[in-house]
Amino acid sequence: MTTAAFTPWILGLTGGIGSGKSAAAERFVELGVHLVDADQAARWVVEPGRPALASIVERFGPGVLQGDGQLDRAALRQLIFADPAQRKWLEQLLHPLIGQEIFSYLAKAQSPYAVYVSPLLIESGQHHKTQRVLVIDAPQDLQIARTLARDNTSAEHVQAILQAQLAREDRLRHADDVVVNDGGLAALHEQIDRLHHFYLTLKGGQP
């Protein structure tokens, strides 16, 4: 089978803000698993010179650009956060392009399985394109504490993001596997390592 025709076994990885998705994703990479991050793909499609960035500037004006021509994501978020119509326009522009980038990179996987990490895996419907869904879960107070420690933001803003995201119960309902990330990094790694071995058995690979 040629590489171009190869469709990997895909694990969808998701979780709410501050749940520990990034730490879980990093562990899969350390274990040699091919990983594609939806947030990275979202950055690729709006790089300077790409058609999507030109469309965004045409709609919102040059104020959404930084001095170096890169997209000012914070400025754009402010413009669309409280405007559902503008947010929908942006999603309709970017989601198909991001999807193309994601599955192009997933198709290059050389590991027994690939991981696709996205905070909107379920909301976007892309979990239907994966073979299994892993949810990284954490208590909401811990999600808030982690986000405040990581980002220069307010508790109110984090609460607003949590309310805008898929409800925790709905996310868990779509999960095939759940990692409860309410401890330290070692505990998270232990759970990811155990699941990695399990996923290799599903694929017939060797740990």
Swiss-Prot record:
It is an enzyme of class 2 (transferase). One of its GO terms (cellular component) is cytoplasm. One of its GO terms (biological process) is coenzyme A biosynthetic process. Its EC number is 2.7.1.24. Coiled coil: none annotated. Residues 10-207 form the DPCK domain. It catalyses: 3'-dephospho-CoA + ATP = ADP + CoA + H(+). Belongs to the CoaE family. This is Dephospho-CoA kinase. The gene is coaE.
